[in-house]
Amino acid sequence: MSAGGRDEERRKLADIIHHWNANRLDLFEISQPTEDLEFHGVMRFYFQDKAAGNFATKCIRVSSTATTQDVIETLAEKFRPDMRMLSSPKYSLYEVHVSGERRLDIDEKPLVVQLNWNKDDREGRFVLKNENDAIPAKKAQSNGPEKQEKEGVIQNFKRTLSKKEKKEKKKREKEALRQASDKEERPSQGDDSENSRLAAEVYKDMPETSFTRTISNPEVVMKRRRQQKLEKRMQEFRSSDGRPDSGGTLRIYADSLKPNIPYKTILLSTTDPADFAVAESLEKYGLEKENPKDYCIARVMLPPGAQHSDERGAKEIILDDDECPLQIFREWPSDKGILVFQLKRRPPDYIPKKMKKHVEGKPLKGKDRADGSGYGSALPPEKLPYLVELSPGRRNHFAYYSYHTYEDGSDSRDKPKLYRLQLSVTEVGTEKFDDNSIQLFGPGIQPHHCDLTNMDGVVTVTPRSMDAETYVDGQRISETTMLQSGMRLQFGTSHVFKFVDPIQDHVLSKRSVDGGLMVKGPRHKPGAVQETTFELGGDIHSGTALPASRSTTRLDSDRVSSASSTAERGMVKPMIRLDQEQDYRRRESRTQDAAGPELMLPASIEFRESSEDSFLSAIINYTNSSTVHFKLSPTYVLYMACRYVLSSQHRPDISPTERTHKAIAVVNKMVSMMEGVIQEVDQVDQKQKNIAGALAFWMANASELLNFIKQDRDLSRITLDAQDVLAHLVQMAFKYLVHCLQSELNNYMPAFLDDPEENSLQRPKIDDVLHTLTGAMSLLRRCRVNAALTIQLFSQLFHFINMWLFNRLVTDPDSGLCSHYWGAIIRQQLGHIEAWAEKQGLELAADCHLSRIVQATTLLTMDKYVPDDIPNINSTCFKLNSLQLQALLQNYHCAPDEPFIPTDLIENVVAVAENTADELARSDGRDVQLEEDPDLQLPFLLPEDGYSCDVVRNIPNGLQEFLDPLCQRGFCRLVPHTRSPGTWTIYFEGADYESHLMRENTELTQPLRKEPEVITVTLKKQNGMGLSIVAAKGAGQDKLGIYVKSVVKGGAADVDGRLAAGDQLLSVDGRSLVGLSQERAAELMTRTSSVVTLEVAKQGAIYHGLATLLNQPSPMMQRISDRRGSGKPRPKSEGFELYNNSAQNGSPESPQMPWTEYSEPKKLPGDDRLMKNRADHRSSPNVANQPPSPGGKSPYTSGTAAKITSVSTGNLCTEEQTPPPRPEAYPIPTQTYTREYFTFPASKSQDRMAPVQNQWPNYEEKPHMHTESDHASIAIQRVTRSQEELREEKVYQLERHRVESGMDRKCDSDMWINQSSSVESSTSSQEHLNHSSKSVTPASTLTKSGPGRWKTPAAVLPTPVAVSQPIRTDLPPPPPPPPAHYTSDFDGISMDLPLPPPPANQAAPQSAQVAAAERKKREEHQRWYEKEKARLEEERERKRREQERKLGQMRTQSLNPASFSPLATQAKPEKPSTLQRPQETVIRELQPQQQPRTIERRDLQYITISKEELSSGDSLSPDPWKRDAREKLEKQQQMHIVDMLSKEIHELQNKGDRTAEESDRLRKLMLEWQFQKRLQESKQKDEDDDEEEDDDVDTMLIMQRLEAERRARLQDEERRRQQQLEEMRKREVEDRVRQEEDGRHQEEERVKRDAEEKRRQEEGYYSRLEAERRRQHEEAARRLLEPEEPGLSRPPLPQDYEPPSQSSAPSAPPPPPQRNASYLKTQVLSPDSLFTAKFVAYDDDDEEENYVPAGPNSYSGSAGTTAGTYDAPRDTREKLSRSQDADLPGSSGAPENLTFRERQRLFSQGQDVSDKVKASRKLTELENELNTK
């Protein structure tokens, strides 16, 4: 609270206290409030002693902060009531007034309760009561209070009463009987409750006296109060209109409530309604505690001359709440009789009805009503009920299906006729009987067809004969039927009318939330014409559809209808304009708190009180969460039960106070049961699979029930404790559920660290993590958990993933995880999580809570080798603090060909982080620590909105089934209310029913529909549709639907205005969107022309149970590089943003690609599909109209390599193989690839084929182009970089600009080879690294070298379940595909794609020097590359010529494009040519490469070679001689492999103590050796038989697999050797540390020995010191009688004492002694400073010999026997100050009761001992005496 607010609060409180003190006795004066608003006062308490039969009283002073519990404990001590008790009684404190009492809650403040009496100057008492006491039988009749017999003491003694006592006893019995009869007539007092007797007993036994009251002068106070109230009311009368007669007095009788009080007079205005008069009357009669809603005022008409008490001939009518009694009384004609008003309890079965007033049980006749029923409450003619024609001029009652209402009340058809029904009988037929009658003509209409009777507010229709066809709501009737507003009447076969009762609808407009919006109406009854059909277009009644009802009883009325004027009554006018009547209704409507019968829930529940516990237990304790269809059924049932307890249907005999207590008890019982269930769920075996389901189920129900109770205007005020407990339960269930899901996630977390090289079926995969998350999300949605809770829960799960991975990175340096390789793997796996979060609308939570691990992996994979990288690192990894950055960089494991990270770079990065991230953390109050906190430091927040009650209408599906078993067993009964508005928020606080009804009057029927309304919308696109869509499957739906997530401001949809969030898009331009995926739907929507026709199901999301989808946050975030040509940022949402921007995609009218070009891809394997969905979900090119590629194919054409879908996720495969399109001449590489590390061992041709390793050539191999015969051509398109990329490296801008400008000049598709920045390490929080593999053929790959360019090879997985993953750093690339054949078709095509815009968030601009260095390196590389390209040109030309000739011959040759001979020059993936070579489409080279040592067998499954590839694979050596030489080498290599296997097997077999790993390896080697032997035999046979090429291919594949496995094993050995070296180094470090520890330990031992020696010397010194002390003492005692002696001898000083230097201040305290050398000399004190130390009195005289004078240093350095002399006495104050200055801080806390030995032992152990001296009392007195001299 602000200071100003607190001051204002204090001032108000002070005024209240001042008023209290002015009226109360001085004893009970209350103090003024403190700054904390606390005050004190004296209170009187009474104690009812049941055993003694009397009351005791005590006054105690109480604070405003003292609770009831505190006061009870104090009073229990004061009254001592439990002296005789054997058990501990339970006490309660009651606030007692004359009118009743109530028990105080435990946490109420009694003094505050007493101060509240100030409001009405009430008097009261506080009574302490033992709840365990039984009521003594007939205690009231036993003895009088003045002569109480102690029944608790003497129970069997019965003495004879005297005459006087007998008389008094009889008198008391008579009084008791009278009181009992009073209580029977006043059920409000709750005569069945013991508490109701307490007030009577207190005031009977302790009558009002000056002793028992608090008010000082009650008569004066009450008189003053009445005077003030009267003056205030009179002022109101005068100020209303100035007339003196606008108010007056009215007598209110209460014969049934207070028969002994004739009447009370109240002051009323003529405009005060009856409900106000009720409240005033109750206060007058002393019943102010009662609920006014339970009482009413009835006007009783007595015959003229009759007395009030004479009830014969009296006619009683209960006034409605808004009628004005005084106005009625003044307008009452005196000749009609006497009018009196009675206050009475509202009958439990009474239902207020409009104009249904009973006079002796008979309805009034029309004439009586016209003459005498108005009483000043005349209504305008517009208030009369009427019939409105539905089908004028059509003779078809379905004609209203398509009309709509205009503002003036007319409609689009012929003008409908409207007939007012006067207060009499209206005849209907072909004949005109009088002005009242309605004349109709047509088939089936009889001359006197039927009668419409309007009496007592009830309108009935009665057919006149069996032939008169009369239908009510489609059902033919033959007898009198009562009409309800909204019903349809049909006369004959063609006349259809709607019956409307404005009075009844006026009540509905006041008391319903949504009016007709939710009314079920008669739509459930077969054969009835659906009212909702009519209301499609809006009601003729000023566009407001009105509810219908099938009930046979009128449910509500508002006030007595007045008789119209005589002229009005006799006429039936067809009226067209109805807006005046609507305005009148709006003016007259008046909000009421009382919920009338029509203002009820869609259903209610009834249960017997005897089975209450069983009923609640069945709902809560025995509900199986997995079998409940509507998961929130318990909540809705419990809420209905609460409302039932609060209603008069539940025990109508009890008082409102008791009803409130009952409701509180029921709610508390519910909450307690729910608490037990949630705790029990958590305590059961955690292995049960349904524990998460049960927790989510009860978390959802607890939160929904809490919302119901909080919002309910009646329950919210009385269930505060239950609300607190429920809120705690929601949080508890949330915590348990988070723990449960985190435990499950923890089992699969190793999937993030799954090495793609080690394929193990047992280990968890990332699919398991995604499955866990998906299961959690579907569980929460199934349980209808609030969206805000869902987001909080997944924030916890994302944080757990972040924490687990990050802590593994930074705390396990030996694991090798801090490497480029693992950084890429973890980042790739995190991409799956982010893609999943994006699909679920949780991308913000994922971005936030995965940020640290994402930035850590980005750090591992980005450039960090030169000082220029420092700004990039710090700006990218801004969330990592200095400790975390230091750990990641220092523990970084470099790849074999990767440069080391400079130490100064690490220091600079850490220094920057200390000034930024560390300071930011400290300013937020967080510690800078290495590890991530396991707990997410965010508070749990209960959602304010988004609950089901806002969207659930009527009885939810599944609720009836949930209750059926309970209903069948008789526990309860479900009562649907068809007349209800259908909303569950009917009793909520602040629900504005009328305005809601008025606002919704054009959409009233929608929630009644089983299916949403379908409309057709035509949009004219400007720069896009302006829609954000999302795909989802609703409840009961088999197929996905496309829903509008949001409408972009300013877009075409926004301008049109008909589309809104929650609408379902059914089709676009006639093509259905139902069942399509989100990306597919986006494709269809982007391929539309400038005019789009959409078929829309309005608010389909709500109808299909997807309302929470609209509640999920979709903030507008500017995406960094996701800009269109216009440069405008695009809003970000869960769905697509559908844009069609001409800057990128051509004009909107650009020719559309044919439908056949957009073949839909097949289902992708799990991860690929998920990644593809994510890719399409994030922003990308396939949401825009792409111009046809130069090859004439759409970029969406399916194919192995041509299916490019996404933002920087790269290209994902489809499983289908389609004929290839023509290759694009201008492929644009995807901007982000995974990093790959390649090992380039030295080979014979390395100096010719590859740069030396120190040169770090800055190039990148582009994805390989395939021949026409390959699976598919690559069509790589430029994509805008993903919106999540935060920045691009500095090289990117210059490189891209240079390369793209080169593309404008050249048609060389290889020019991308030097655009290193196109594969920069984009540092994004959501960047995907798992891509690229699906965009190329299975044999293709990407290579890159140079600093920061170590790409982890993306393994190409042809298998359906394969996931694109990085390959090991030191494995060779798979064999390259053959060079593509390119014809001249593509030559000369210029670059026509626009350049991508510069990124929005760039790093610092590159300096000119860096740019120049980059250019120089590039030019050197290009020069080197020119020579290589020239050689390639020649090779290629020769190859092409030979291929045509020798194609068949080459098929029979077993060629291996990437054979693994360590001796031969091997083919390497080709490198594209430089930019300087025009007129080339693709130029690549094959670079020989010496093979690394090992390769995994699994890696070879990616090396699939087709016949065409084999035929063109050996392009550089097509002649047979080279081929023969190579085949010989292969044979030698195979033999060499077998020999190596044999050797290794022999070594392992000879090894005696093999480890488990070695045994496993031996087994694998044996299998491999056998396989190799069989392979050699098979190959020999193959060569002999000269088999077909296919067998050769198989043999080569087998050889490749064998060689790969062999090399993988060798690599494993190398890795193990590396690990052994690491372990050796670790051991050396540990040995060194151990040696240092030993040295330190020896040093400490030496110091200890020295200290021991010192201690022995000290003991000798202290013994001498003690002897000297005794001598001084004796001498001092001797000199006591000689005060003129100049001084006292000092204790001996150490031998090495030196006087302090003159320069040092005499009072300066010496330095404290060293902890580990207490006996080392530090500083020797002067005699003064030694002797003036503080002394501490010690009471034991026997301890004198232990006295040790201790100075500040406790003589830590003293040793010796030199004695000093006392020069002169000093002033006591000077000594004291010096001794205090010399005292060490903290020394006062040491123990002073130690013996000398103990102090010596502490010294020897190096511990500090107190500086205070332990002195005897005598010595202390002596010293004080000496000091005063």
Swiss-Prot record:
The protein's assembly and partners: Homodimer. Interacts with F-actin, nectin and NECTIN3. Essential for the association of nectin and E-cadherin. Isoform 2/s-afadin does not interact with F-actin. Interacts with ZO-1 and occludin, but probably in an indirect manner. Interacts with RIT1, RIT2, NRXN1 and BCR. Interacts with ADAM10; the interaction locks ADAM10 at adherens junctions following ADAM10 recruitment to adherens junctions by TSPAN33.
tRNA-binding in keyword set: no
Location of the protein in the cell: Cell junction, Adherens junction
Comp. bias regions, Low complexity: 1316-1325, 1401-1412
N6-acetyllysine PTM sites in chain numbering: 1812
Record protein name field: Afadin
Record key words, sorted: Acetylation, Cell adhesion, Cell junction, Coiled coil, Phosphoprotein, Repeat
Organism expressing this protein natively: Rattus norvegicus
Residue positions, PTM Phosphothreonine: 1218, 1239, 1337
Phosphoserine: modified positions: 216, 246, 256, 391, 424, 512, 557, 562, 589, 655, 1090, 1114, 1133, 1147, 1150, 1179-1180, 1189, 1206, 1245, 1282, 1335, 1506, 1517, 1701, 1726, 1779, 1804
Positions with biased composition (Polar residues): 1139-1150, 1195-1217, 1332-1344, 1450-1464, 1715-1724, 1753-1764
GO biological process: adherens junction maintenance; bicellular tight junction assembly; brain morphogenesis; cell-cell adhesion mediated by cadherin; cerebral cortex development; dendrite arborization; establishment of endothelial intestinal barrier; establishment of protein localization to plasma membrane
Gene Ontology molecular functions: actin filament binding; cell adhesion molecule binding; LIM domain binding; small GTPase binding
GO CC annotations on file: adherens junction; apical junction complex; apical part of cell; axon; cell junction; cell-cell contact zone; cell-cell junction; cytoplasm
Residues annotated as domain FHA: 441-507
Biased composition (Pro residues): 1371-1380
Signal peptide: none
Spans annotated as Disordered: 129-196, 356-377, 539-595, 1114-1230, 1300-1533, 1574-1724, 1742-1829
Disulfide bonds: none
Residue intervals of the Dilute domain: 668-915
Coiled-coil residue spans: 146-186, 1417-1454, 1530-1564, 1600-1672
Tissue occurrence: Isoform 1 is widely expressed, including in heart, brain, spleen, lung, liver, skeletal muscle, kidney and testis. Isoform 2 is mainly expressed in the brain.
Other known facts: Isoform 1 increases the viscosity of F-actin in a dose-dependent manner. Isoform 1 causes F-actin to associate into bundles and meshworks.
Residue ranges constituting the PDZ domain according to the UniProt record: 1014-1100
